[in-house]
């Protein structure tokens, strides 16, 4: 029996051609739309910070006119000179660095140790202790009792008032404990068979395997410690050498609000009278303060980004 070839008619051939074209055009349109959308999103996200940088490098008297977008009209360093004119700003910077590093390291180590302990099913008091820590997330004694507690602990006007209260975090403990729950139990059991104790298991197995979530927690703790100024205002305001960078910048910003009308206040903030009257305004000072306070965290974030993205997915995938 002879083979018969069936050739498509003109109508079906045209339909096939249209489908092929549509299959080629649709991905191009989709990618083009996504690219345009992401470019717009990046511009919307980055422009406020870029504009803040522009304002910080522009003369304050000119900034009041408005219309600053991508480049300063009257470029000046005067805003940053006003920020760094105070001799206390450098000491405050190192206090903030020391506070941030110590708070982050101690919080990570102690909170992870607590999370590992409360993740062990054989621990008898696991549930009541977990409940106690969760309650601290909802109930706070308040500012005045907190101050008297710090006073009774002899932490007022000491560096450790920045570190000790932040050594344990209930929320971070819950996040880390959730991550520890994804680590195979067989690893712990094998280590115990080999004679390893709980602390050795924690240091050699659990802690290294928690790097992704610890990087995420480290970023949260570090940003919180770096940006904090209210505790310096409450607990160490009478001891200038313990002032933090954020507290000094906050005082400078507050002083600049009255700089034009009260040059004496400007001089107290490290600004000359000429700068206070013409080159520096509260808006330009605020922009410079924002940049100075943000740069250290922006420099650290790229190195943490890989672990940060992984850590955000903790608990989102159930194996």
Predicted regions mapped to residue ranges:
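A hydrophobic, multi-pass inner-membrane permease signature
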Residues: 2-319
């Amino acid at each position: 029996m002879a083979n018969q070839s069936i050739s498509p008619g003109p109508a079906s051939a045209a339909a096939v051609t249209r489908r092929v074209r549509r299959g080629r055009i649709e991905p191009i349109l989709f990618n083009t739309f996504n690219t345009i959308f992401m470019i717009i999103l990046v511009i919307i996200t980055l422009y406020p910070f870029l504009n803040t940088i522009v304002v910080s490098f522009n003369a304050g008297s000119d900034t009041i006119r408005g219309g600053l977008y991508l480049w300063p009209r009257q470029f000046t360093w005067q805003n940053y000179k006003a920020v760094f004119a105070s001799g206390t700003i450098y000491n405050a910077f190192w206090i903030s660095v020391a506070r941030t590093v110590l708070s982050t390291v101690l919080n990570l180590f102690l909170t992870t140790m607590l999370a590992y302990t409360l993740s062990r099913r054989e621990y008898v008091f696991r549930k009541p202790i977990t409940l106690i820590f969760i309650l601290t997330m909802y109930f706070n004694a308040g500012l005045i009792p907190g101050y008297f507690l710090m006073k009774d602990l002899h932490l007022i006007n000491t560096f450790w008032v920045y570190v000790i209260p932040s050594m344990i975090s209930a929320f971070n403990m819950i996040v880390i404990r959730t991550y520890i729950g994804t680590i195979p139990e067989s690893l712990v059991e094998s280590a115990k068979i080999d004679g390893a104790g709980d602390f050795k298991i924690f240091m050699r197995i659990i802690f290294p395997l928690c790097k992704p979530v610890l990087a995420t927690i480290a970023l949260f703790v570090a940003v919180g410690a770096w940006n904090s100024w209210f505790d310096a205002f409450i607990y160490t305001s009478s001891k200038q050498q313990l002032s933090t960078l954020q507290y000094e910048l906050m005082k400078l910003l507050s002083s600049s609000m009255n700089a034009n009308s009260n040059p004496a206040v400007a001089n107290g903030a490290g600004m000359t009278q000429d700068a206070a009257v013409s080159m520096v305004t509260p808006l330009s000072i605020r922009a410079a303060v924002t940049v100075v306070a943000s740069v250290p965290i922006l420099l650290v974030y790229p190195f943490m980004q890989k672990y940060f993205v992984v850590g955000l997915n903790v608990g989102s995938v159930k194996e």
